[in-house]
């Protein structure tokens, strides 16, 4: 565990010409700028997506190198005078607080060196201005995180796994077949960049493009020919980096739809498929990827018609023969249902009752806030109780937060870390965050749940996951200290240390702890040590980000009365 002590820095507004740019030092604890001459992050500003055309901001180390190992980042920044009179470069910390700002005159281009002390993700906006008004905003992140690849070796997978959903094939292409941003990047290049960034966070399990190519019928005798080229590439990108697979089994190709539904012309993949073809497809997938599977998940969100348009009974039939096929070759691998979406409570209850005998993990999905996830989890428990069953383990196989507006990236980071901690504390086998990189609605103009953006910038959520993993690698969950009135605190054990993570849904509140520890280290959401306390008693002011208290040589930790 690397600890970084924090200092306080203050930055001032200035106007610069080419060659006048000194190094800017960013530290975890800073003072807010008194005046900000650009719109705040909740204001909608037309986005300038790509460098050029009047605004340029690129890392000198090379395209997409927004994350630094040593904290040093040099940006090439330029403002075209034919497009803008000037631009304002602003740096915002992960609390959406502006901490640095410079004016840059039109016709200026130069190197902008930054040193980041400690860990963290910072937002950089470059606002092109004319006649005193912002016309376009370029948005990027610069980030330093610890390399947590080694966490896959120390993480206690049998207690709780931390996973990520990534779709380098699906999200590299638009529905019309054109590559999404960034321009000129091949699917292979994009896939490897994303895989490197996800591996660096220490994730152990991935759900990726296993069902990207559905195969085709080879002859009238129902022989099947499957093309795994793109799936092999997607899976190998992660297994070669030490990941296990959350192997999701979707339907085979459209030609294999059951005869009863042959009249359907659109979205045939949503309907029941011929048993022979579906079994052949499942067998082929398992032969190829089964040895790497952490668990196998049969289908996705069957309780909503946009994924399953057959009857509930037809789904149960297909689920049962799918399980039989899995068990022929992999009798021990855990099986999960496709995560429930709670779109139709009656369907969800039906599936829980009928599928319970066939699953090892009872799976559900929950995007949005922690409160929304808790609501879905309570529904899961209530519906299981209503039919008198209890799963061996819960699992959340898809959960994210839509950063629908630029200021919401802070909420995204908070919610992602909160949900990991909550699931860990509530008897889940694991959690699958959604998602690595999502390029629908490139940039911040549309719906986006990615930990990294379309330019491979690591968002605040990326830094928050890195902070969580850096502090809790090798941990075992110990106890819930408090879950009431929007305040949460969880206790973990890591070797000789006890670690408490605490947060508040209201962005306010405080907790006091007492222990027999020799020392307490207070860590911020990004994993920086911001305070050290002699002895075992400590007070903590709360906000929406989980913070971490590391109690050295502690036998016990409790809330103070």
Label the model's feature ranges:
Residues 4-15:
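Bacterial N-terminal signal peptides
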Residues 18-197, 201, 208, 561:
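Mature N-terminal, pre-catalytic/accessory segment of carbohydrate-active enzymes
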Residues 64, 89-90, 482-518, 524-526, ...:
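Carbohydrate-binding surface patches
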Residues 176-198, 278-287, 344-354, 411-420:
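Short, acidic/polar
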Residues 201-357:
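Substrate-binding cleft and catalytic face of glycoside hydrolase catalytic domains
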Residues 357, 361, 366-440, 457, ...:
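Catalytic-core region of carbohydrate-active enzymes that cleave or remodel glycosidic bonds
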Residues 425, 439-440, 447-497:
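Glycan-recognition and catalytic regions of carbohydrate-active enzymes
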Residues 533-561:
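C-terminal beta-strand-rich structural cap/linker in extracellular carbohydrate-active enzymes
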